[in-house]
UniProtKB/Swiss-Prot annotation:
Keywords for the protein's UniProt record, in alphabetical order: ATP synthesis, Cell inner membrane, Cell membrane, CF(1), Hydrogen ion transport, Ion transport, Membrane, Transport
One GO CC term on file: proton-transporting ATP synthase complex
InterPro entries per record: ATP_synth_OSCP/delta_N_sf, ATPase_OSCP/d_CS, ATPase_OSCP/dsu
Role played: F(1)F(0) ATP synthase produces ATP from ADP in the presence of a proton or sodium gradient. F-type ATPases consist of two structural domains, F(1) containing the extramembraneous catalytic core and F(0) containing the membrane proton channel, linked together by a central stalk and a peripheral stalk. During catalysis, ATP synthesis in the catalytic domain of F(1) is coupled via a rotary mechanism of the central stalk subunits to proton translocation.
Protein name: ATP synthase subunit delta
Family classification: Belongs to the ATPase delta chain family.
UniProt-recorded Gene Ontology molecular function terms: proton-transporting ATP synthase activity, rotational mechanism
Domain of life: Bacteria
Any Pfam family: OSCP
Originating organism: Shewanella sp. (strain MR-4)
Subcellular location: Cell inner membrane
Membrane topology, as annotated: Peripheral membrane protein
């Protein structure tokens, strides 16, 4: 994955710079998300790794995307096809989203809890994270009964493990040392 990120970074940065310059960050985010979905399609995958000429591949990809991709987005697709990089579109989309969130002073936080969180609990977590990170926080909540109780929160580089499973694991490590 690190290699894909390295390959995708210049494309994501260039797309983001163009998006900011043209005040079209949300439009670009939607285009890249759609293009990433197309590139991940099981019918499209063999074409991306096959021996199809880059101009034909770009034309095919653009025709599949249709009106979802504007002229600037089509130019990005053409350049990526020419360099054999269409398979990294999901990584480009992901990096673009990170650049967008950083630019908008937003962060996505993954919250995994043992049981479904109430709206009040979600609001408390969101407020606490916004204070700690000095950013607007968007929560992605999920459940995992294996946590036993508590939550695990991941927001950027920050990881807070308040789960019983995590506490038991840390206790076990201390006892073994």
């Amino acid at each position: 994955m690190a290699e894909l990120t390295t390959i995708a970074r210049p494309y994501a940065k260039a797309a983001f710079d163009v998006a900011v310059e043209h005040n079209a960050v949300d439009t670009w985010a939607e285009m890249l998300t759609f293009a990433a979905l197309v590139s991940e399609n099981e019918t499209m995958q063999p074409l991306l790794t096959g021996s199809l000429a880059s101009t034909k591949l770009a034309a095919l990809f653009i025709s599949v995307c249709g009106e979802q991709i504007n002229e600037q987005g089509q130019n990005l697709i053409k350049v990526m096809a020419e360099n054999g990089r269409l398979k990294v579109l999901p990584a480009v989309s992901e990096l673009f989203a990170q650049y967008r969130n950083e630019w908008a002073k937003e962060v996505e936080a993954d919250v995994v809890s043992a049981a479904e969180l109430s709206s009040e609990q979600k609001q408390q977590i969101s407020i606490s994270l916004e204070k700690r990170l000095a950013r607007k926080v968007k929560l992605n909540c999920s459940t995992d009964a294996a946590l036993i109780a508590g939550v695990i929160i991941k927001a950027g580089d920050l990881v807070i493990d308040g789960s019983v499973r995590g506490k038991l694991s840390r206790l076990s490590e201390k006892l073994q040392s």
